[in-house]
C-alpha cells in the first residue's frame, strides 16, 4: 500500500471503535474509470453521494488473476493522480447480464444523466473498448 493510502486508511481507522471489523482488513485502493480525468469526475460523484454503485466485466478480474468483488470488501477510492479521497464498503455484489441491468441500478451508479439509456450507451462503449 502506498504511503498516502496507508496514511488515509489510518486516519479512517482512527474514527472507528477499537473493535470495529474494518480494523482487521487491508483495503484495495483503486480509481474508477480509465483516465485521470474520468477518475477525478467519478471520485467527485462518490464524495457527493451520487455514485453508489459500479459495474465491471467479470473477465477483467479473471484476466489478471484477481478475485471477483465480494460483499463486505472495503476499498479506498483514488483520484486520477492517485490521491485517496474516500473509503467505501461493498454492501452487495451481483452478476447480472448486460441486458438485465435495471433503471434503479443505473441511477445508483450516478453517471451521465442517471438514466438506463445513458448507462447502457456508456457501458456498451466502455465494455466493447475493454475487449
Q: Can you name each region flagged by the protein language model?
A:
Residues 1-87, 93-131:
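Mixed-charge, low-complexity intrinsically disordered regions
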